């Protein structure tokens, strides 16, 4: 009798289940979307990812974008990197921004909402110069 786990993958008694399926306590199939990105030993990286992103929403967005497998690997690599950085440096930061804003819910405000008032402010040339009484006279030696 051989040992076989819930994933159906028998690897000499070791069940080769990805960190995503392990976290969600579901069967990990050979065609699992997260298997190449989160093998069993990268459980902490999956938890970092899972804090920021929804699994199903991410899968849907990547499919909607129609990325090639290479582009998909690049995107997932960036998302995983961002998640790991965010776990090390939590909280809002200029240095750490959400790389893939397409994965954000629509209710979140755009960064342009913060920049637009600055862009629309009057140019410096429209500000009148200070009164002559405040400017010291130039002296030549």
From Swiss-Prot:
Record domain LOB: where: 16-119
Record Pfam families: LOB
Highest taxon of source: Eukaryota
PROSITE patterns assigned: LOB
Family under the similarity heading: Belongs to the LOB domain-containing protein family.
Designated name of the protein: LOB domain-containing protein 34
Lineage summary: Eukaryota, Viridiplantae, Streptophyta, Embryophyta, Tracheophyta
Gene giving rise to this polypeptide: LBD34
């Amino acid at each position: 009798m051989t040992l076989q786990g819930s994933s159906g993958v028998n690897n000499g008694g070791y069940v080769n289940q990805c960190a995503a399926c392990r976290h969600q306590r579901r069967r990990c199939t050979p065609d699992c979307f997260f298997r190449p990105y989160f093998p069993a030993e990268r459980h902490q990286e999956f938890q970092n990812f899972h804090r920021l992103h929804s699994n199903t929403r991410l899968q849907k967005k990547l499919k909607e974008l129609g990325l090639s497998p290479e582009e998909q690997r690049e995107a997932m690599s960036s998302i995983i990197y961002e998640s790991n950085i965010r776990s090390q440096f939590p909280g809002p930061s200029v240095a750490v921004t959400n790389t893939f804003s397409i994965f954000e819910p629509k209710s979140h405000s755009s960064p342009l909402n913060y920049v637009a008032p600055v862009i629309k402010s009057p140019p410096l040339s429209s500000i009148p110069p200070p009164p002559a009484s405040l400017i010291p006279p130039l002296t030549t030696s």
